[in-house]
Amino acid sequence: MSTNGTATETGTAEAPALGEELITRGRTITESDLVSFSSLTGDWHPQHADAEWAAAGRFGERVAHGMMVLSYAVGLVPFDPERVVALRGLDSVSFKRPVAIGDTIRVHTRVDSVRPLDDEHSLVSFAWRVLNQHDRVVARVRVDALWRGATADEPETEIVPNTVLL
């Protein structure tokens, strides 16, 4: 992830700036993606795998698995392995709209809080909105990452949202 932090001689980096935002490149969802994800997970629900069944349903066509969309979002967000130690959690996951074959998704991410844990690490919380090619939100999630670089003597900072990400 692009950050304002810089590497130091010890190999650590500052935590990202509060409020920092990034919009990723896009990725178009293909039929092969649906088949591959179904094969990997064993989720062959007809909404994803049966064109005739899906055509008669709520969305009128096959749509991507919600977890596939979330997994691809993780792959779209660039994280520096020298800074990001581990994914610590996902919270407030919601799937707002279907993603169909041929849709292109991208991720808008914002740093919402930085909480120093010790002399070398912080817990950084990101608000992610997964958008389609029409800039409509298809999914939202709060992502917590263990970040190398901030120190415990730095104050905890947080953005207190006055609205829910839509």
Go through the PLM ranges and name each one.
Residues 82-103, 107-109:
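Mid-chain, well-packed structural core segment of small domains
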Residues 1-18, 99-103, 108-166:
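HotDog/MaoC-like acyl-thioester-processing domains
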